[in-house]
Each structure stands twice: as structure tokens, then as C-alpha cells.
Regions:
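N-terminal leader/signal peptides at the extreme start of proteins
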Residues: 1-35
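N-terminal cationic amphipathic segment used for targeting or macromolecule association
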Residues: 9, 20-24, 43, 181, ...
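N-terminal single-pass transmembrane signal-anchor helix
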Residues: 31-62
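Residues in the signature-helix immediately C-terminal to the ABC NBD "C-loop/LSGGQ" signature motif
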Residues: 42, 56, 68, 72-75
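Regular, well-ordered alpha-helical segments
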Residues: 52, 60-63, 67, 79, ...
Length: 293
């Protein structure tokens, strides 16, 4: 007797189509309506209005963040200033390279300094070489080679204010001068030939400036009478104070604190004053020069 095997009918049920075909047909039969020109213009107008409202706020927030970062960096340089003096028997770092005993314009050759018999150079006690190692940063002398100079101007470098804008000609490797958007108070050493940390601390450290926002070429000024030449040098004071943060700038003081100040509270702006564009004297909240006993 022959046994008949059951077979499964694999034929497609009548009236059913594959899912993909069904969807395709539905899409062909369906109706869709795009945006009309008027609706599109309305959307664009709304987005433009939102941009006008948001962009100024975002820009202000960014500038505020840069100001806070600059303040933090200046405060760190103040700490490094103290650490260096403590490690060197109270002797403070110099604000500029001055081979003749007077503040001069610092070029890359002076950053490198003159060789000494022990294999070092005589520029290692200038603040831009002496203090960076205190913060695990690279001394400026390491940027003196032509191939490395462009890296010096990177505003991520702690030696610069992150909001600084350097003139284009300064960014050429052949430009002979490093520009500093932060500077050490140029009046400290000029107060006397051997100013020490103890002398500063014995005076009025809470008002004595150590570091400041330094004016660069092309940046806004507190007053037109401020200096216009030799800007961006590593030593500066009121006449080169840079108000790049909302009409003001940052200062770091000898007691370790730092703060933002309006430009007119740092620079003399009274017309007719012989000090216009320079420091405010007698000093109120800000002292540049040390009073020796």
C-alpha cells in the first residue's frame, strides 16, 4: 500500500501581496503636501529672529568666559612669582631683559640672552623664562627658534590672555619681537636696584600690582594718550594697560588676589592732567611703584 505524504501548500494566499509592495503602493497612492513659499519664509524669519536674540547673549557669555580664564592665568602668575622668590632667597624675577641696567625693548635675541660660563644664559631670571617652570609651562626661550615662534602666540599658552588678538605682522616667524598680552609690572624693579619679595610684602601687597592685561597694537585703549609704541613688551604699567574685557582689564596683586578693573580706575583719563594716559596719582586702589623705607 502506497503511503501518501502530506505536503504543505506554499502557494501565496490569494489576495495578499508582499509587504514592500504594499507599502510602495500606499506611498504612490498617498498624498503629501510640502511647505509653501510663504510658510518657508515664515520659518526662515523666525529662525533669523531667534539668531538675533541669541547671538549677542552667546557672544557676551563667551567674552565673560575669556575674562574669567584670563583672571585665573594672572592669578597663577602671581603664585609663580612668589614661589620663584621663595626658591631664590627672596630675589624676584626681572620684568625685562636689561643688559645695561635699564628696561629695553625685548627681542628674540634678548629672550635667548647671553651665554654664561656654566652653560646657561643671563636671561633665565626674566619672568617669561623664570616663572613658567613654576607652573609646569615651557619657558619663552624654548620658542626662540624660527620654527617655534608661531607656537608662542597660541592663546592657549598661559603666558597670554585668551582674548588677546595679535597683529598679523607679529605672527610671521621672521618678526624679531615676542609680544606679550600679559605683562609684569615694569615699575617694581625700577623702584630700586634690589627689590626683594620681603620689601613688597612689607609695603602694601593688597594694592601692589604684579601682573596686568597688556595693551597690543590695534586693541581698544582706555584713553588716546596711552602709549602707542613698543606695545606688547613683557614689562608694562598703567600707560600700557589693555582694557580688552568689557572696557576693563585684569590685574594680579602681590597678596595673591586678582581682579577686574574698569579702565578709568586704572588709567588717568582726566583731560588736562599731566598724567593723562598714565597712572592715577596719588594711588587709590592700585600701586605700581614700591615705597622704599
Amino acid at each position: 500500500m502506497k503511503i501518501r505524504q502530506n505536503t504543505v501548500d506554499r502557494a501565496r494566499p490569494v489576495g495578499l501581496r508582499p509587504f514592500s509592495l504594499a507599502v510602495s503602493g500606499a506611498l504612490r497612492k498617498g498624498t503629501s503636501r510640502g511647505l509653501t513659499l510663504i510658510e518657508l519664509l515664515i520659518v526662515v524669519a523666525v529662525l533669523g529672529l531667534l539668531a538675533l536674540l541669541l547671538f549677542p547673549s552667546l557672544a557676551r557669555a563667551r567674552q565673560k568666559a575669556l575674562q574669567v580664564e584670563c583672571l585665573s592665568r594672572l592669578r597663577q602668575w602671581g603664585i609663580a612669582f612668589d614661589h620663584y622668590a621663595e626658591d631664590n632667597n627672596g630675589r624676584i624675577a626681572r620684568e625685562c631683559y636689561e643688559p645695561l641696567g635699564e628696561v629695553t625693548i625685548n627681542n628674540w635675541s634678548q629672550v635667548k640672552g647671553r651665554p654664561r660660563p656654566d652653560g646657561t644664559t643671563d636671561s633665565l631670571d626674566v619672568w617669561y623664562n623664570a616663572l613658567p617652570p613654576e607652573l609646569n609651562q615651557v619657558a619663552t626661550i624654548r620658542y626662540a627658534a624660527l620654527a617655534d615662534r608661531i607656537r608662542f602666540f597660541d592663546t592657549r599658552n598661559l603666558i597670554h590672555c585668551p582674548a588677546a588678538r595679535f597683529p598679523k605682522h607679529a605672527l610671521r616667524p621672521t618678526y624679531q619681537f615676542p609680544l606679550f598680552s600679559m605683562a609684569m609690572n615694569s615699575q617694581l624693579i625700577q623702584s630700586g636696584p634690589s627689590i626683594r619679595l620681603s620689601t613688597i610684602e612689607a609695603g602694601d601687597p593688597a594694592r601692589t600690582v604684579l601682573f596686568l592685561d597688556n595693551l597690543l597694537e590695534g586693541e581698544p585703549r582706555v584713553h588716546p594718550a596711552q602709549e602707542r609704541t613698543h606695545l606688547g613688551q613683557p614689562g608694562a604699567y598703567a600707560n600700557r594697560f589693555g582694557p580688552r574685557h568689557d572696557d576693563g582689564g585684569n590685574l594680579a596683586f602681590a597678596d595673591g588676589h586678582a581682579g577686574w578693573f574698569r579702565g578709568r580706575d586704572v588709567v588717568q583719563t582726566e583731560e588736562g592732567s599731566p598724567l593723562v594716559g598714565g597712572p592715577i596719582l596719588p594711588p587709590r586702589d592700585i600701586v605700581w611703584e614700591i615705597s622704599l623705607p
